[in-house]
Curated annotation (Swiss-Prot):
It is found in: Cytoplasm. Residues 382-648 are annotated as: Mediates direct interaction with MYO6. One of its GO terms (cellular component) is cytoplasm. This is DISP complex protein LRCH3. LRR repeats lie at residues 56-79, 81-104, 105-127, 128-150, 152-172, 173-195, 196-218, 220-239, 240-264, 266-290. Residues 568-590, 621-653 are annotated as: Disordered. The modification Phosphoserine is found at residues 324, 415, 419, 611, 628. Disulfide bonds: none annotated.
Length: 777
């Protein structure tokens, strides 16, 4: 009995040891259900695989994740997996996508994460229902072309060895998410702009140098291009209106600068909009595509709705919830209709007038006033209205268009080139009117007895019409040539008149300037009534001749004769200067050809010394000659004006010489070459601080200098540099009266004062350096 018990114990021990070691006893099936051991033997693996395949056949979801599979399970042939919609083969050791998985025609989701896949077979084209593909953390070097022919919506290919993306990637029209991060991609093909549905693009940790401009047309919501080598964000990216998240850290960005990028998306897009407004004329055609906006201002403050996905930038929630947000308002939509109705009413009114006047022809006198209205109408109306105007009756006398009136018409055409008179339209108008009048005057009742005579005289009538048209066209052409010649003569006479007026004014002013020491108040002398300005009624135009007179006075320097506005009284029509009445200019004006202005206008046109040009001339001469207005009695002579002008020119030459010396001093001391714009080069104070440290080391302890990421200093840092420079000059020993102000440097308005300060600073340099520097200069 004891021996039997020992044998049973030994057998039990052997059984347990065998199970623990993973072996199998003959006739004993070990598994999780047997309760002996954890169940990690080959039998348990095969049983779990079979169970997973059975579940996939029932549910359509195949889950074989984390099983260290090197190939697809052979037992899958015993199950019907054609209806599988989701397959998870992640965390295995597959070297390629299994061929068996490529026959699941109903597959929509395929996860091959973290395998050893180097190749994607062409049989994957069988998966025409596949919308999700995860092939991340594999060993792919390229994406095959046939992969781009699938109806994918999500493609995740991160953590591979991809060098580039195929150009056929543009065929993925339904792709909404593309993740190719952590690869070795150097360029993104321009065909990516064809991905019309792309919402999420992740190209993080690649070798990208620039971003394609075609991305600006995509409705991206999330964009991640961090950890690359990108230096510039294209200006056209301001059109990414749906963008909500942009990640761009760990890039050597220069545009926008780093200090703007760290502030976030809103500041980045504001910078891009500002740059677009600056360089809008110079942008390539791609950036200047029509966007539905009129200007940069409208892009910054747009109220255009973009649907549920809105980045919050470039959009304003105005509370307008109408469906017609992009439709024109009623005011603008009704405008063409109203214009069409008004035009139609005018045309109907003219036709009714024509019908009323047809019975009784009204012969007009062809006067200047009537023709002026007619020619204004031709100038300002469209071609359709010109044709309608032809229907209105005119006088039968063609000679009423005198050469004087045609000269006026031609003058209007020359002076208003924007709306020229069309001589062809006038000629057609004359021919049509002559034909209608001729037919109306020779019209007879159509009686049966006159039908034969009408047919017999048809040829004679047509011949007469032809001769009449030729004669009429010759007359109009000759009148037009006369008008052109008269217009040219008018222009020549006008130029000659202006020259004579200017000479007369200059002679008069010189004469008054020579008499100014003898008269105390030349403008207040009421006996002679002399004035250095001619009356405005003796000139052709209202402001041009006055401006010419002011320019003549500026040349002579008679600005002090201008009185104050409160003390100056406009001259009456009878107070014209006698000298000016007898001047040749006035005679030329009054004896000019017949197309001059009416005499009534010349007599009733008063003088307006308070006009804009008058005040502008007073202000210009006052600022040029003196710091404050002078009394009328202090009229300078021509010699004093010449001396002031010479003094100003000498002062300017001295300033230029000081600036040139300043440039030479700085370039010699610091061994640098300054740009042509010296003021802009010294604005930030960096060069001046280095110059102070060159004269005495460590006189400026800290200098703010620009960096590649921030190429331009802020105004606060520039001011700090300038103040440090001036403080260093003060400590070195530059006298206070020779120190310039910070504004002289910051605003580039006092380079001569800066030159004086630098000269005083260099005089305090060590003797050897000073002597060597002076000898070099």
């Amino acid at each position: 009995m004891a021996a039997a018990g020992l044998v049973a114990v030994a057998a039990a021990a052997e059984y347990s040891g065998t199970v623990a070691s993973g072996g199998n006893l003959p006739g004993v099936h070990c598994g999780p259900s047997s309760g002996a051991g954890p169940g990690f033997g080959p039998g348990s693996w095969s049983r779990s695989l079979d169970r997973a395949l059975e579940e996939a056949a029932v549910t359509g979801v195949l889950s074989l994740s984390g099983r260290k599979l090197r190939e697809f399970p052979r037992g899958a042939a015993n199950h019907d997996l054609t209806d599988t919609t989701r397959a998870d083969l992640s965390r295995n050791r597959l070297s390629e996508i299994p061929i068996e998985a490529c026959h699941f025609v109903s597959l929509e989701n395929l996860n091959l994460y973290q395998n050893c896949i180097r190749y994607i077979p062409e049989a994957i084209l069988n998966l025409q229902a596949l919308t999700f593909l995860n092939i991340s953390r594999n060993q792919l070097s390229t994406l095959p072309v046939h992969l781009c022919n699938l109806p994918l919506k999500v493609l995740i290919a991160s953590n591979n060895k991809l060098v580039s993306l195929p150009e056929e990637i543009g065929h993925l029209r339904h792709l909404m998410e593309l993740d190719v991060s952590c690869n070795e991609i150097q360029t993104i093909p321009s065909q990516i702009g064809n991905l019309e549905a792309l919402r999420d693009l992740n190209v993080r940790r690649n070798h990208l140098v620039h971003l394609p401009e075609e991305l600006a047309e995509l409705p991206l919501i999330r964009l991640d291009f961090s950890c690359n080598k990108i230096t510039t964000i294209p200006v056209c990216y301001r059109n990414l209106r749906h963008l909500q998240t942009i990640t761009l850290d760990n890039n050597p960005l220069q545009s926008p600068p780093a200090q703007i990028c760290i502030k976030g998306k809103v500041h980045i897009f504001k910078y891009l909009n500002i740059q677009a407004c600056k360089i809008a004329p110079d942008l390539p055609d791609y950036d200047r595509r029509p966007l539905g906006f009129g200007s940069c201002h409208e892009e910054l403050y747009s109220s255009r709705p973009y649907g549920a996905l809105d980045s919050g930038f470039n959009s304003v929630d105005s509370g307008d919830k109408r469906w017609s947000g992009n439709e024109p308002t009623d005011e603008f939509s009704d405008l063409p209709l109203r214009v069409a109705e008004i035009t139609k009413e005018q045309r109907l009114r003219r036709e009714s007038q024509y019908q009323e006047n047809r019975g009784s022809l009204v012969v007009t006198n062809g006067g200047v006033e009537h023709d002026l209205d007619q020619i204004d109408y031709i100038d300002s109306c469209t071609a359709e209205e010109e044709e309608a105007e032809v229907r209105q009756p005119k006088g039968p006398d063609p000679d009423s268009l005198s050469s004087q009136f045609m000269a006026y018409i031609e003058q209007r055409r020359i002076s208003h080139e924007g709306s020229p008179v069309k001589p062809v339209a006038i000629r057609e108008f004359q021919k049509t009117e002559d034909m209608r009048r001729y037919l109306h005057q020779n019209r007879v009742p159509a009686e049966p007895s006159s039908l034969l005579s009408l047919s017999a005289s048809h040829n004679q009538l047509s011949h007469t019409d032809l001769e009449l048209h030729q004669r009429r066209e010759q007359l109009v052409e000759r009148t037009r040539r006369e008008a052109q010649l008269a217009a040219l003569q008018y222009e020549e006479e006008k130029i000659r008149t202006k020259q004579i007026q200017r000479d007369a004014v200059l002679d008069f002013v010189k004469q008054k300037a020579s008499q100014s020491p003898q008269k105390q108040h030349p403008l207040l002398d009421g006996v002679d009534g002399e004035c250095p300005f001619p009356s405005r009624r003796s000139q052709h135009t209202d402001d041009s001749a006055l401006c010419m007179s002011l320019s003549g006075l500026n040349q002579v320097g008679c600005a002090a004769t201008l009185p104050h506005s409160s003390a100056f009284t406009p001259l009456k029509s009878d107070d014209r200067p006698n000298a000016l009445l007898s001047s040749p200019a006035t005679e030329t004006v009054h004896h000019s050809p017949a197309y001059s202005f009416p005499a009534a206008i010349q007599r009733n046109q008063p003088q307006r010394p308070e006009s804009f040009l008058f005040r502008a001339g007073v202000r210009a001469e006052t600022n040029k000659g003196h710091a404050s207005p002078l009394p009328p009695s202090a009229a300078p002579t021509t010699d004093s004006t010449d001396s002031i002008t010479g003094q100003n020119s000498r002062q300017r030459e001295e300033e230029l010489e000081l600036i040139d010396q300043l440039r030479k001093h700085i370039e010699y001391r610091l061994k640098v070459s300054l740009p042509c714009d010296l003021g802009a080069a010294l604005t930030d104070g960096v060069v001046l601080c280095h110059l102070a440290n060159h004269v005495r080391p460590r006189s400026v302890p800290s200098i703010h200098v620009p960096s590649p990421a921030v190429p331009k200093l802020t105004m606060a840092k520039c001011r700090r540099n300038v103040e440090n420079f001036l403080e260093a000059c003060r400590k070195i020993g530059v006298p206070q009266e020779q120190l310039c102000l910070p504004l002289h440097i910051l605003e580039e308005k006092g380079l001569s004062q800066v030159a004086v300060t630098v000269q005083a600073l260099l005089e305090l340099a060590p003797p050897k350096q000073q002597q060597h520097q002076l000898s070099a200069v």
